[in-house]
A protein has these predicted regions:
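Amphipathic alpha-helical assembly/interaction segments
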Residues: 1-87
Length: 87
């Protein structure tokens, strides 16, 4: 296994772990946010995982990596918003 393949596997595993942890955290969301903001975060995390898997299978990764960057920025923003709304 090359170091590039290993790095790809690590980031996919870390994203998987993030999703598991986020589910525990999102159980504490108020009902009003569970079906809107929490659903948006879940969708974004699944999209991120899907894009990472797709990037690991492609030879030319540039456009997929740009999509991953956009999705990750959106996920960061929604999680930050959820944190601020909680306070």
């Amino acid at each position: 296994m090359s170091s590039e393949q290993y790095k790809e596997m690590v980031i996919i595993q870390k994203t998987y772990d993030m999703i598991e942890y986020a589910y525990v955290c999102m159980r504490q969301f108020p009902k009003s946010e569970k079906f809107t903001l929490a659903a948006e975060i879940k969708t974004s995390m699944y999209t991120l995982l899907k894009l990472l898997i797709a990037a690991s299978k492609k030879y030319y990764k540039k456009t997929t990596l740009q999509e991953i960057d956009i999705e990750l920025q959106f996920l960061k923003t929604t999680v930050r918003l959820a944190t601020q709304l909680r306070n």
